[in-house]
């Protein structure tokens, strides 16, 4: 059973639909006991850092997520769900994130010829040992929609990178905690393979 955390985040239904298409058993919930009993947990997200943290707090999910990530349950953050795993974001100065992984979320720098938000397909440079990308070609294309990006404090957790006006840490893996800045649920067959790899952990 894979639990998708429901905290009024935008891309929840598309993540659920992608997993169901893979034959996975999925539960959408904001109930802590249900989430803690799941075999795997996904934190989706589209929206602002500060508002998302307020919602997680309001629904009593901050401690739940910290318990899940601390007890060895495979956990996947998607898009804003990646950003929330870190302590702070340029998007909402003063708001405190989950602070589960080391790093910060920065605004994508402006550059002539590049639109922000970054919306579209980019290729990834993936580490060969990255478990989420097992069985994929070296530079798969995935779909991004974001104005802020991760700069991880520990290069050792970076599983994939991309370039868009700057060097972007596009995916991280640390023990049982995985996260993607891009949207696997919108990334065609490559994205489904990534979700299948997570479901198979």
Regions found by a protein language model. Name each.
Residues 180-201:
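Acyltransferase
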Residues 139, 173-177:
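Beta-strand-turn-beta hairpins that frame and shape the catalytic cleft
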Residues 167-173:
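Short, surface-exposed beta-strand/loop micro-motifs that present aromatic residues
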Residues 38:
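An anion/phosphate-binding loop that grips the pyrophosphate of nucleotide cofactors and donors
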Residues 88-164:
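Pocket-forming structural segment of enzyme catalytic cores
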Residues 47-118:
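Cysteine-nucleophile active-site neighborhood
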Residues 2-24, 182-186:
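N-terminal beta1-alpha1 ligand-phosphate binding loop
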